[in-house]
């Protein structure tokens, strides 16, 4: 972990294979130890983590706040409805208010792309040492979700050593609304970095063909890709093409709130063509795990009985794994500024 080089975590395009290994290894150590009640880790004692969520959130916000508290950090939550934004205060001034209060990390979620990056750049220019962690921005990125999905898959394939090597050579199918999904974009960066081949499945209006080249060019603002060899991305139009040979399947929520008018007019037709069921998963040719980043539209992207089948569904496991992954990210960001807390040396 000594090679960690990210003050801010804004996306996964800039992550190297070593970065993924650092996060997954540390998260696995956190997952394997009790850290509630009196046994909280003192790693971030005296630090302040502020969650600035300008979009609704259940899982992500709660998970970050639990993660911070389990590392003994203080937590300050921001709610737009009761803030000075309604009085005309700018988003940057709101962020600076929390910096002035002593925030060490700002976890920022916003409906517009690049807002966390803009805040990070503004704070850097003014010499502030506060770190920014992207909790999801527009259609761009959701790095902690991509990492927890990666860890969930790695742990499923190799419970004792859930590292990037467990993903190498796997065929991972992602079904549904890729166009509007920052989760899908983060998963593309993470999965291909670890050597998985990703198959995207959906209608052209939700899975444009140009996604096949999504990870081929160097990430924006970088001269080269930090990952030497990536897996491939394929786009197909039917589940009959996508599922045979799959090692895992992820389905995505239809984000109707982000869709332009008439982009998708018939939910029943979508379920008929792309909804996952026990019967359809038989096309994989073997038992495979099912993931969904939530929230789930039962009866649209998948059948309710499939979601409740814990021999297949890893959805609740994804939620559980979100806490140790976010603990790992907060710890690594704190370690960027100072030496890691020696209490972690005792973790198995």
Swiss-Prot record:
GO molecular function: amino acid binding; aspartate carbamoyltransferase activity
E.C. number: 2.1.3.2
Enzyme class, broadest EC rank: transferase
Keyword line: Pyrimidine biosynthesis, Transferase
This protein's GO CC annotations: cytosol
Positions contributing to carbamoyl phosphate binding: 59-60, 109, 142, 145, 294-295
InterPro entries: Asp/Orn_carbamoyltranf_P-bd, Asp/Orn_carbamoylTrfase, Asp/Orn_carbamoylTrfase_sf, Asp_carbamoyltransf, Asp_carbamoyltransf_Asp/Orn-bd
Metabolic or biological pathway: Pyrimidine metabolism; UMP biosynthesis via de novo pathway; (S)-dihydroorotate from bicarbonate: step 2/3
One GO BP annotation of this record: 'de novo' pyrimidine nucleobase biosynthetic process
Pfam families given in the database record: OTCace, OTCace_N
Catalytically driven reaction(s): carbamoyl phosphate + L-aspartate = N-carbamoyl-L-aspartate + phosphate + H(+)
Function, as annotated: Catalyzes the condensation of carbamoyl phosphate and aspartate to form carbamoyl aspartate and inorganic phosphate, the committed step in the de novo pyrimidine nucleotide biosynthesis pathway.
Family, per entry: Belongs to the aspartate/ornithine carbamoyltransferase superfamily. ATCase family.
The name this protein goes by in its record: Aspartate carbamoyltransferase catalytic subunit
Organism: Prochlorococcus marinus (strain MIT 9313)
Gene name of this polypeptide: pyrB
